Amino acid sequence: MKFSVLVAIVPEELEQKVVDNARDLGAGGITILGGRGIGNNTKKTFFGMTYEGSQSVVLMVLEKGLSLEILKAIQELLIDKDKKSHGVVFTFALEHLGGIDLSQLSKFENHLKDSI
């Protein structure tokens, strides 16, 4: 079985939608880290202070096929009606893995069987 790490960097206000969507599609354990983004756009200022906005970094270890399915669903959440993106989502291959809950492995196996 091949695994991928899915990373979604989203505004805090979209964090729960991303988590709920991923869980609905079969994700188990999810790790969320706080962060702040420095993008290409001019920063907002308020009384002389620069506001950069808080970001959530959502991490998931997933079976490779499931990671693509979840990536596509999250991507749809991040694009608004004006076609503007409010985050980024990507995956990368995971070579070695230890400590994953065995019940999660059986969920991944079931997903593989269902997709065949």
Features from the language model and the residues they span:
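Positively charged, small/polar-rich N-terminal and surface patches that mediate targeting and assembly
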Residues: 1-116
